[in-house]
């Protein structure tokens, strides 16, 4: 008999800073998941980085037992998801393990772009979406306006949305009651052959690969032999359990539950995310539909400062890819920086987070080159190639057509900041698609070049709208554009790691700005250092870092002018010889100067 009516699986989805993690804390407290001593703010954000930045990066799962007012005890498996646009992949994976989702909306700020995007993902996957108005204790909370926005912008009924304040704990028990009533119980047979979906996995130095799974059918317990469908390998289960949020072992995991499986898998790619697990004696079980592979949007080169760290760096990347399956990498070598990897990220925040995690968790020193998006080139020979690294661009004479990626951006902004946002979009070469007035907010849709969006668009959008505008974007198409490669020459030598692909209209401005920025960052040498920006063979900007020179005339008090001339000529000849053989050290900041051209 498989009675799953007491299980509820749900995710919490919301825009950044609308209080998902705080609400999760309240659930844990009310259901007694942790003692008062162990409780801390944002208990699920376990990474230091998450706490410092105040954002959720990884989705976290928790199993709690809630005694409802009808006298039954329900098992709640919930997943706290990230709200930032760079981590939408984490959200879609979490939703695949659930039957319902709580849409948390800040009652002061109202609906924002990311809530809309995540909510549509949930509805597409057939989940029951239950709106919750959070932050009701704030003086600026306006529940009626926000309910109206939820109905107008997202299109789900919000008349009886539950109002609560996760910070003060007001109304949280009501959220749990409503959740138990409105979110459906999972379906599945405990007696059927095991079928489990891997939602997430990470590497533990002692336990091997730990996989977070959602069991669809059957059950799994310690001592079972499991088969990983994609690799065909069989592993012995060491332990199964759930997070309460502590690591808690249980006797077994049954259909409808979410928990972890440890089976001493030592190979990092032994249990990929989105794979199906079954028992070794029922290998004919169907593979569950996994997750679509996500395409990175931004590429950047990562190089270890010391070449001795290359092997450690590769191991670290492998372990990180297991935990973050949207990260892609391949080996790359650069004349200026030696050996490293070209990594693909979902956006700039993702790139920063990965670099910081590598430096902290694996103790590496890294240099990052300027990020670039993927361009499509049609060559004179008729073939089409994609390029993600400016230094790998073929010669201009061989290229027939240059195409850049265009994204469709949806921006939600209060009416008073609309003018600034439109000005910013025009500056970034945007084309307006449509505009809708929804209550006090405006929803504008723009087609924007992706390389303008990924660099600093998000920060500029926030500052121009005083933090009120919100953004969601997705790749739409490739479109022809007048693009050129901007090379940076230092003392006449091209530095491959500093090359950029820019629009021809902005090239002269970008070239000047970049050389000026580099002049500030490259330390003065004993000889003049020329910094030039060039398109092909044409130099479009130049600055010089002046030489440090010793005053060789200090010892000549009076005396003949020819004596002074002789000393100056001697110094000049020495500097000239030095310049021919001298190397210039380029500091890490210079490689990232490209990012901060506009600021």
Swiss-Prot record:
Its EC number is 3.6.5.n1. Gene3D superfamilies: 3.30.70.240, Elongation factor 4, C-terminal domain (3.30.70.2570), Elongation Factor G (Translational Gtpase), domain 3 (3.30.70.870), P-loop containing nucleotide triphosphate hydrolases (3.40.50.300), Translation factors (2.40.30.10). GTP binds at residues 17-22, 134-137. It is found in: Cell inner membrane. Keywords: Cell inner membrane, Cell membrane, GTP-binding, Hydrolase, Membrane, Nucleotide-binding, Protein biosynthesis. GO terms for molecular function: GTP binding; GTPase activity; guanosine tetraphosphate binding; ribosome binding; translation elongation factor activity. GO terms for biological process: positive regulation of translation. GO terms for cellular component: plasma membrane. The keyword Oxidoreductase does not apply. It is a peripheral membrane protein. It comes from the Bacteria. The keyword Protein biosynthesis applies. Disulfide bonds: none annotated. Required for accurate and efficient protein synthesis under certain stress conditions. May act as a fidelity factor of the translation reaction, by catalyzing a one-codon backward translocation of tRNAs on improperly translocated ribosomes. Back-translocation proceeds from a post-translocation (POST) complex to a pre-translocation (PRE) complex, thus giving elongation factor G a second chance to translocate the tRNAs correctly. Binds to ribosomes in a GTP-dependent manner. Belongs to the TRAFAC class translation factor GTPase superfamily. Classic translation factor GTPase family. LepA subfamily. PANTHER family: TRANSLATION FACTOR GUF1 HOMOLOG, CHLOROPLASTIC, TRANSLATION FACTOR GUF1-RELATED. This is Elongation factor 4. It comes from Pseudomonas entomophila (strain L48). The gene is lepA.
């Amino acid at each position: 008999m498989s009675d799953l009516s007491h299980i509820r699986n749900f995710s919490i989805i919301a825009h950044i800073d609308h209080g998902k993690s705080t609400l999760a804390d309240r659930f844990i407290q009310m259901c007694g998941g942790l003692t008062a001593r162990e409780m801390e703010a944002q208990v699920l954000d376990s990474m230091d980085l998450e706490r410092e930045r105040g954002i959720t990066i990884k989705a976290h799962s928790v199993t709690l037992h809630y005694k409802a007012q009808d006298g039954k005890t329900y098992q709640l498996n919930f997943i706290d998801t990230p709200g930032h646009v760079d981590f939408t992949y984490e959200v879609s994976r979490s939703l695949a393990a659930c039957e319902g989702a709580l849409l948390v909306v800040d009652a002061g700020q109202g609906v924002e772009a990311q809530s809309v995007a995540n909510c549509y993902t949930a509805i597409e996957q057939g989940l029951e979406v239950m709106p919750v108005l959070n932050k009701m204790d704030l003086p600026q909370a306006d529940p009626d306006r926000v309910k109206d926005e939820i109905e107008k912008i997202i299109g789900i009924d919000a008349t009886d949305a539950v109002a609560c304040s996760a910070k003060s704990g007001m109304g949280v028990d009501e959220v749990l009651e409503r959740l138990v009533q409105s979110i459906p119980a999972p379906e599945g047979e405990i007696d059927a052959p095991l079928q489990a979906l891997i939602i997430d996995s990470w590497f533990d130095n002692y336990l091997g690969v730990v996989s977070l799974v959602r069991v669809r059918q059957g059950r799994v317990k310690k001592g079972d032999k499991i088969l990983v469908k994609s690799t065909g390998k069989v592993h012995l289960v060491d332990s199964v359990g759930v997070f309460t949020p502590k690591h808690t072992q249980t006797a077994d995991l049954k259909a409808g539950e979410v928990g972890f499986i440890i089976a001493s898998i030592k190979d990092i790619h032994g249990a990929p995310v989105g794979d199906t697990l079954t028992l070794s004696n029922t290998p004919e079980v169907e593979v569950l539909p996994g997750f679509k592979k996500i395409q990175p949007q931004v590429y950047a080169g990562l190089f270890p400062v010391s070449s001795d760290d290359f092997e450690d760096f590769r191991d670290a990347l492998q372990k990180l890819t297991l935990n973050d399956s949207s990260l892609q990498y391949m080996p790359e070598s650069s004349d200026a920086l030696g050996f490293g990897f070209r990594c693909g990220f979902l956006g700039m925040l993702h790139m920063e987070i990965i670099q910081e995690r590598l430096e902290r968790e694996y103790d590496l020193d890294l240099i990052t080159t300027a990020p670039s998006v993927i361009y499509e080139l049609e060559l004179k020979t008729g073939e089409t190639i994609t390029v993600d690294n400016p230094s790998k661009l073929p010669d201009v004479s061989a290229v027939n057509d240059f195409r850049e990626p265009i994204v469709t951006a949806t921006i939600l902004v209060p009416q008073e900041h609309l003018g600034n946002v439109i000005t910013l979009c025009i500056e970034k070469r945007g084309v307006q698609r449509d505009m809708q007035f929804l209550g006090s907010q405006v929803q504008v849709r723009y087609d924007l070049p992706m390389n303008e969006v990924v660099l600093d668009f998000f920060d500029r959008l926030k500052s121009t709208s005083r933090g009120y505008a919100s953004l969601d974007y997705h790749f739409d198409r490739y479109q022809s554009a007048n693009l050129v490669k901007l090379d940076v020459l230092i003392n006449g030598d091209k530095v491959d790691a500093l090359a950029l692909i820019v629009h021809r209209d902005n090239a002269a401005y970008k070239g000047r700005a970049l050389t000026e920025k580099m002049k500030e960052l490259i330390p003065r040498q004993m000889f003049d250092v020329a910094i030039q920006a060039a398109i092909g063979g044409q130099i479009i900007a130049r600055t010089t870092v002046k030489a440090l020179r010793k005053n060789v005339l200090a010892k000549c008090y009076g005396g003949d002018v020819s004596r002074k001339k002789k000393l100056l000529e001697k110094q000049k000849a020495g500097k000239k010889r030095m310049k021919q053989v001298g190397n210039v050290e380029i500091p890490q900041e210079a490689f990232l100067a490209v990012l901060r051209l506009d600021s």
